[in-house]
C-alpha cells in the first residue's frame, strides 16, 4: 500500500473542497450572515492548510492500483464529509456534530435524508452549501479531480481504478482513449444539463436562488429540499414537471448522452438498460395513478403526482410533491421496489442499478431454462453482446453483500424501537441514497428521532451505498493495508 500517495490525493481533495466552499461564503456575505461567514472562513482555512500539508507529502511512486484506488476513494469521501460538516457545527445552526456529519454525508452521497425539522430556518449560505454538496457528490468529487488535474501519461490508465471505484454501476469503461478526457466529457454533459434546468425553472417563475439550489439537488439526484414541503411548496405543474423530467434525465447512463452527441443513435436504441428503465417508469406511473385516483380531484392530478414520485424514487432523488406515505399499500410497495432498483448505471442515481436487475433477471431466466432443458447451452447477452460468467458472479456477490449489510444495519438501528417499516425503509433509503423512507422518515418526516449511534450507522450506509459496498468493506481487510515491497 502506497500510504504517501493516498495522503497526497486526500490532501488535494481537501484543498479543492476548501475552494468549493468559497461560493457559499460569498452567499453568506451577500445576505449579511456574518456568523456563517466566520464559520465558512474558519472551515476554508482549515481545509486549505491541512490539505496543503497533506499534499506536500510526496510519494516516491505514483502508481495507482486497485488497493490504492479503493483506499483513496473511501477515505476521501469520509474526509470531505467530516470537514464539510464544519460550517454547520461552527455556526451552531446544527449544534450536534453527529447531526452535522449526518447532514453532510447525506449531501455528498446525494441521499437527501435530513435531521432538520425546519429547513427554512437555515441560513442562505448553509442552504447553498447543503445543496451544492449534492451537485459535487453526484458525479463524484474524484471524477472532478481527474477532469481538472493533469495526471501524466503514465498514470492515465491507472486513474481508471479511481473512476471505477467511485462511479456507480457494475461496469465502467472509457468514453474516449484518455481517462482525463472521459472525466471532462462527463462533467461537460453534467454542467450543461444543470444549466438548462436552472434556465427552465427560472423562466417558469421560480426565484433564481431556488432555481439554482433545486437544480443542484436534481442533478445530483440528491433531493435536499429548501422548503419544508419540498417541491410541493411550488404550486406549479410546470415547475414540478420540469424537475420530474430532469430527475429522469439525470437517472440515465451518461454514456447515452455521449452517444447522442456522437449521433450514434443505433447504439442508443439498442441499449437494453435504457429500454428497461423507460418501461419500468411508464408501467409504475400508470399502476400508481390508477391506484391513487380516488385521493385526487382528477386523473390529471393523479398522473401528475404519480409521475413525479416515480421519477423521484427510481432516480433516488427523494423530492416530493405530496406525502406518499399516506398512499395505498400497492403504491407504497411499488415505490419501495423502485427504491431498491434505483437508476441506470453510470448515472448520478443510486440503488442496485437497472443494469444489475436486468442481468439478474436474464441470469434467472437462463437458469430456469437449464432446469427444463439440462443439455441446452444458454449465454447471457446484454445489448446483443455475450457477457461472461464473471459479470453474473460479481452482480450476484454484490446482491449478497447488499442484503447482508441491509439486514445488519436494520438490526442495529432497531435498538431505537421504531416500527419495522420505519427501520427498514430508513436503511433502504440511506443505502440506496434516496432520502425519504416511509412512516416517521417519510417525505414529511425526518431522521432527527434516531439516536447518535443509529445516525452513525445510517451515515455509514450512505457512504457504503454511494461507493457500492466493496470499496468501503475493503478498508476492513488487513491485506489491503499491507506494505508493498
Task: Give the positions of each predicted feature.
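Membrane-proximal intracellular helices of multi-pass ion channels
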Residues: 1-485
